[in-house]
Amino acid sequence: MSHRQPNRRERGVTRLLPETWRGLTLLLAGVLLLYYLLPIGALVFAQSPASLATDVTNEVVLTAATNSVVAATLSTLVAVAFGVPLAYWLSRTSFRGRDVILALVMLPLVLPPVVSGMLLLRLVGPAGLGQLTSVPLTRSLFGVVLAQTYVASPFLVVTAKTAFDGVDRQLEAAARSLGEDRVGSVRRVTLPLAKQGILAGVTLTFARAIGEFGATLMLAYYPRTLPVQIWVSYLSTGLDAAFPVALVLVGIAVGAILLVHALGTNPWE
């Protein structure tokens, strides 16, 4: 039985479809990229370069930037220290109630940040654990770290768990059969293979932490971080006064992502 050969028109349509799809893909991708870029461009050109340079080097802005970077770094380190073991445990164990724990981990991702701040304030505020310790748990850098860790650490746990899920358990078993103990097999086999996913989680956690506003506002209005300072500047002076602070925040966030890429550990490759 012979098959009919496509005619010239049909062959032309066949060649045209991939080209059309490629063009449509580039168009849609370009529109979204432009949508990401235009607000940043509007932010950069909102003021003259001289005025912008003066505003971003203001002591208040620099102090808020320092608070943000320090707190976000500490929050990310805390998330790594506790989140990576939690992610590994959730990935490698199966038990009744596991889904409940996963839901608990993801809860801060779906709660409005202000609600997260309210919950934390009830827990560690003057009516909670705050009355049991002399360490200031609110209105302090420690409070900022608590707020940022609560809302940002789930990004690390979720991405690290996904990375661990992608590592074959048989590789750990093979390492143990060659003399490695459980810790050694995880350190020498699983962690290197899951590294890219964990780094993606670190980047997302830092970016989320440094941009955290709602929970931080509820728990630690002082010392001011960049998001809180943006809000204060907007309320006190107006949108123009908030632009330079926002630009510093954008610059730090972009710089953190570029730093990961520059170190040769781009988690998205």
From Swiss-Prot:
Membrane topology according to the record: Multi-pass membrane protein
Main subcellular location of this protein, as a coarse class: membrane
Location of the ABC transmembrane type-1 domain: 65-258
Keyword entries, A-Z: Cell membrane, Membrane, Molybdenum, Plasmid, Transmembrane, Transmembrane helix, Transport
PROSITE patterns, per database record: ABC_TM1
UniProt GO BP: transmembrane transport
Disulfide bonds: none
Pfam families: BPD_transp_1
GO annotation, cellular component aspect: plasma membrane
Membrane-spanning segments: 26-46, 69-89, 100-120, 140-160, 198-218, 243-263
Compartments where found: Cell membrane
Main function: Part of an ABC transporter complex involved in molybdenum import. Responsible for the translocation of the substrate across the membrane.
Subunit structure: The complex is composed of two ATP-binding proteins, two transmembrane proteins (HVO_B0370) and a solute-binding protein (HVO_B0369).
Protein name, entry field: Probable molybdenum ABC transporter permease protein HVO_B0370
